[in-house]
């Protein structure tokens, strides 16, 4: 009997019953994919969807993003009814589009419009990775190009928040040509003295990273964002070298001169406000007709 006192007993983990799981409504708790901490969802939302334990930036949808940076009630949306078709008759593409529309309550992977930041008018575009992984098809490219042209007409800055897996394969070359179309629109805006701020969020990859996302007068990013063209494995197989652990992160790009700043979500609105304030009455006043 005494000998049993010094024997290490096996530890058992209690597994919640199915009834216990059902007692916690869906969406009440959120698990951080980085530190694995489980938190109340309302606590994460209150903190702009940033983990209160490790600072991981959870993805934001387009409306959450707009609410976090624009003055309350100032946003006016552009081209809301524009939707993608299936010009290449790609199998199941229309069904997938319809599924994403129902799931996200969006017509496409980008929301564009105008609003104010501390009463300064801007045209803004926000990509939403919930819709076809934020991929760029004809409508995404067209909406962004139109938004840039609107910024040109209004003589105001253009700001974009990117989150994308790249060009949309279901639209083939029609998708790839959006890289050129958006870049040309931005060049016109730039030549006229227009300010363009690009904010890259997780993930910004493929044709989006290789076109408009990297063309900002200011290129910013959120902490830990994955930014790059090809995938890590493809690059390693091509160069036959092991890449650094932090390769293609926002911090790696900042260290190597490809970003101007990595900005915490808490500081994003204020950082944008300061940039806009610097350019008020400066180069923005020297518009060419």
Swiss-Prot record:
Named cofactor requirement(s): Zn(2+)
Catalytic activity: N(6)-carboxybiotinyl-L-lysyl-[protein] + acetyl-CoA = N(6)-biotinyl-L-lysyl-[protein] + malonyl-CoA
GO molecular function: acetyl-CoA carboxylase activity; ATP binding; carboxyl- or carbamoyltransferase activity; zinc ion binding
Zinc finger annotations (C4-type) as residue ranges: 32-54
EC number: 2.1.3.15
Keywords: ATP-binding, Cytoplasm, Fatty acid biosynthesis, Fatty acid metabolism, Lipid biosynthesis, Lipid metabolism, Metal-binding, Nucleotide-binding, Transferase, Zinc, Zinc-finger
Gene3D superfamilies on file: 2-enoyl-CoA Hydratase, Chain A, domain 1
Record GO cellular component, one term: acetyl-CoA carboxylase complex
Cofactor, how bound (note): Binds 1 zinc ion per subunit.
Source species, domain of life: Bacteria
Subcellular location: Cytoplasm
Keyword Lipoprotein applies: no
Recorded metabolic or biological pathway in which this protein acts: Lipid metabolism; malonyl-CoA biosynthesis; malonyl-CoA from acetyl-CoA: step 1/1
Record has Transmembrane as a keyword: no
Sequence intervals crossing the membrane: none
Enzyme class, UniProt record, top EC level: transferase
Binding site for Zn(2+): 32, 35, 51, 54
GO biological process: fatty acid biosynthetic process; malonyl-CoA biosynthetic process
Domain CoA carboxyltransferase N-terminal, residue spans: 28-289
Pfam family name, one: Carboxyl_trans
UniProt-listed HAMAP family: AcetylCoA_CT_beta
Family assignment from sequence similarity: Belongs to the AccD/PCCB family.
Subunit description: Acetyl-CoA carboxylase is a heterohexamer composed of biotin carboxyl carrier protein (AccB), biotin carboxylase (AccC) and two subunits each of ACCase subunit alpha (AccA) and ACCase subunit beta (AccD).
Function in brief: Component of the acetyl coenzyme A carboxylase (ACC) complex. Biotin carboxylase (BC) catalyzes the carboxylation of biotin on its carrier protein (BCCP) and then the CO(2) group is transferred by the transcarboxylase to acetyl-CoA to form malonyl-CoA.
Name recorded for this polypeptide: Acetyl-coenzyme A carboxylase carboxyl transferase subunit beta
Organism: Bacillus cereus (strain ZK / E33L)
